[in-house]
């Protein structure tokens, strides 16, 4: 009987891990997860000071971006871009993006993102993977390239890993980012 109860405990732990591994809310960027309140991480003054109108061109778009760079609480990423609903006084997170610059060698960015992708493939179980290489639409010279990997979950949530190899004329620094986005933000972004 003791053997069976041990087996049941092991099986329960195993299946619980699988279930957790397919919920992006269990994944963190700089300690933040989808569904968390930004107020648990930053003061309201910092949030308001760093609110950006990146989506003003999207009619009736219900989300705003907060971009925080080089903050003392950021340990792994140079900056984070956070998405919350407009007028939400609790600043509940629907999208989290962490990014770093590749100032010396973009190949380091490619290596880092390949390792992160391998980790995601080990951690998460139920998703479709899409990969794409394309020219960035912000660069009129068409010399800026993006290498992207998307993890699309059955419930509409998405994780993306991107490397931006910017053309010299646009003047941006090469960078990579990792985004975790809840279904509601993904749908709103695609539909507007």
Model-derived regions, located:
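Short hydrophobic/aromatic-rich motifs at helix boundaries and adjacent loops
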Residues: 1, 9, 89-90
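Non-cytosolic coordination micro-motifs
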Residues: 21-65, 95-192
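Asparagine-rich low-complexity intrinsically disordered tracts
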Residues: 2-5, 41
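Sterically constrained small-residue positions within well-ordered secondary structures
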Residues: 12, 71-73, 87-89, 140-142, ...
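Sec-dependent N-terminal signal peptides
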Residues: 4-15
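Compositionally biased P/S/T/G-rich terminal and signal peptide-adjacent segments
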Residues: 67-92
């Amino acid at each position: 009987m003791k053997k069976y109860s041990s087996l049941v405990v092991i099986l329960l732990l195993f299946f619980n891990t699988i279930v957790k591994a397919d919920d992006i809310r269990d994944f963190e960027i700089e300690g933040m997860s989808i569904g968390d309140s930004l107020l648990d991480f930053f003061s309201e003054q910092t949030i308001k000071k760093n609110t950006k109108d990146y989506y003003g061109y999207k009619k009736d778009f219900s989300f705003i971006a907060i971009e925080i760079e080089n903050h003392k609480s950021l340990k792994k990423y140079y900056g984070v871009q956070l998405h919350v609903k407009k007028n939400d006084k609790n600043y509940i997170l629907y999208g989290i993006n962490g990014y770093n610059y590749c100032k010396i060698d973009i190949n380091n960015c490619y290596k880092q993102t390949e390792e992160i992708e391998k980790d995601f493939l080990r951690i998460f179980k139920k998703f479709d993977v899409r990969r794409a290489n394309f020219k960035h639409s912000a660069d009129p010279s068409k010399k800026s390239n993006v290498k992207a990997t998307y993890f699309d979950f059955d419930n509409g949530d998405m994780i993306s890993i991107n490397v931006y190899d910017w053309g010299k004329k646009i003047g941006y620094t090469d960078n990579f980012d990792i985004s975790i986005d809840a279904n509601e933000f993904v749908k709103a972004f695609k539909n507007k």
